[in-house]
Structures are given as structure tokens and as C-alpha cells.
């Protein structure tokens, strides 16, 4: 049987959990195998900036951080299940990559 590997990426872990729950419900309804969601390492992007705009005075820095969370879900690539996966309502800041394996 074919397997679909779905990689979810986003900055809000609650929205990722929402999409994972939708995928779990699809797997239960269609009766296909489900593995995951597997949490992958969180990527931290740190941007240090100077607090003072003119460059004079004490060199104090602020650090801004963006965390990118990732989840990996494996689901059986049944035709019915894949049609429902394509119809899942995905929030704006969550991206999905689907890879089919034979």
C-alpha cells in the first residue's frame, strides 16, 4: 500500500496541533494507517538589534526570536483519505508538504 508523508511547518504550535487532529480524524473515518504526529526539532531564528537608533551611547542589544515548529505525519495513501486531506482547512501560518511513497 502507498504511504503519504505529510510535513507540517508553522510558527504557532496550537495551530499545528489543530491540523494534526484533523488528519487523525480523517484516518479514523477512512480506516487507514496513521503514524505520528512526530515532533521534529524546533528551529530558532535569532536576530540581534541595537536598541539605540543613532549608534551613540551604550551598546545595548535586543534579541528577537522566531521559532519554527515542525511535525511529521504518515498516513495511508488511500484515494478517499487523500481527497479529504486536500480539503483540510489549513491556517495561514501553517505550510504543508505531502510526499507520496510507494
UniProtKB/Swiss-Prot annotation:
Pfam families in alphabetical order: Ribosomal_S10
* Ribosomal protein in keyword set: yes
Single GO term (MF): structural constituent of ribosome
Could you tell me which InterPro entries the record lists for this protein? Ribosomal_uS10, Ribosomal_uS10_CS, Ribosomal_uS10_dom, Ribosomal_uS10_dom_sf, Ribosomal_uS10_euk/arc
Keywords attached to this Swiss-Prot or TrEMBL record, sorted alphabetically, are:
Ribonucleoprotein, Ribosomal protein
Biological processes per GO annotation:
translation
Gene Ontology CC terms: small ribosomal subunit
Q: Which PANTHER family match?
A: 30S RIBOSOMAL PROTEIN S10 FAMILY MEMBER (PTHR11700)
Quaternary structure, per UniProt, is: Part of the 30S ribosomal subunit.
Record function comment: Involved in the binding of tRNA to the ribosomes.
Q: Mind telling me which NCBIfam families this protein's record contains?
A: uS10_euk_arch
**Family named by the database record:** Belongs to the universal ribosomal protein uS10 family.
> What is the name attached to this protein's record?
Small ribosomal subunit protein uS10
Amino acid at each position: 500500500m502507498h504511504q503519504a508523508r505529510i510535513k507540517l511547518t508553522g510558527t504557532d504550535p496550537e495551530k499545528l496541533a489543530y491540523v494534526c487532529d484533523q488528519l487523525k480524524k480523517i484516518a479514523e473515518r477512512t480506516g487507514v494507517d496513521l503514524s505520528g504526529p512526530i515532533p521534529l526539532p524546533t528551529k530558532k531564528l535569532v536576530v540581534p538589534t541595537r536598541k539605540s537608533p543613532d549608534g551613540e551611547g551604550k551598546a545595548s542589544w535586543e534579541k528577537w526570536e522566531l521559532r519554527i515548529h515542525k511535525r511529521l505525519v504518515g498516513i495511508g495513501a488511500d484515494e478517499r483519505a487523500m481527497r479529504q486531506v486536500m480539503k483540510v482547512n489549513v491556517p495561514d501560518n501553517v505550510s504543508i508538504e505531502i510526499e507520496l511513497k510507494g
